[in-house]
Amino acid sequence: NHFDICVTSPPYWDILNMKRSADQKNTVNYSEKVNDMGNITDYSEFINTLSNLFTLVNKVLKKGGYCIVNVMDIRKKSNFYPLHSDLATALQKVGFIYDDLIIWDRQADYNNMRPLGYPYKFRINKVHEYLLIFIKE
C-alpha cells in the first residue's frame, strides 16, 4: 500500500501490429518480445493478462487510491471488441470500485472523419477514448 494513484494507458491489444486502414501509415509496435502484452493475439488472453496486472496494481495502491485507465474500443474486420467495458468488468472482479467513466473527445487529435471501410462496408471512425476511473476499496 504505497501509492495514491496509478494512471496508465495499456496497449490496445495487438492493434499496433495491424495494418492501419484510416491513414495508411506504417505499423509501429512496441517490441517483438513474447511477453509484450501488445503481441498477445487472443483477446480473452489479453484481458486475462491485464486483469493479472491490475491485481498487482490493486495490491500496491493505498486504500481509497485511484486507478485511471485510458483505453479505446477495437474493431478488427467484422468483429467489435468493447475493450473499455471488458476491462471495467475485469477490474471490478479484482476488487476495484468502478467510480466513473470519462469519454475523451479526440477529434481534434485525429482530425479524420472519413468513413472507414469505404467502399466495402461503412464504418464510423472512432474519435474518442475512455478514461476508466476506479478506486481501491
Where are the regions a protein language model picked out?
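Class I S-adenosyl-L-methionine-dependent methyltransferase catalytic core
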Residues: 1-137
